């Protein structure tokens, strides 16, 4: 049983880390790398020769990594086409990373549907090609 578990983990771990690393490069830098736990959860982030435990990352970095993780899983599950729902995120993200994340939202949104619920639409105002719908508009549909 353990052998089958380990085989399944290996089958999913490498593609997940590869997708996560590719998505994270524009946000965290070109040499970013993540290490996973046995449960396929991010344990550490390495960048510029420094490795940081997940728990020691800033709130903004954790929030960004949570979104990147969803994007990576969506790419793997449906070959890039699974919808991703984001609920009022990026509140702890600085302006520079917010711009980088906006570019990433656009890139992912070209391959899959990305739905963002927010009470702060300004956080996502830099996402090219976005469609904004107010709650009033959504209720009338």
Where are the regions a protein language model picked out?
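N-terminal/domain-start segments enriched in small and hydrophobic, helix-friendly residues
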Residues: 4-10, 79-80, 84-92
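C-terminal lobe/lid and adjacent interdomain/linker elements of RecA-like ASCE P-loop ATPase modules
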Residues: 22, 96-141
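GG-anchored amphipathic helix commonly corresponding to the ABC/SMC/Rad50 NBD signature/C-loop
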Residues: 59-85, 108
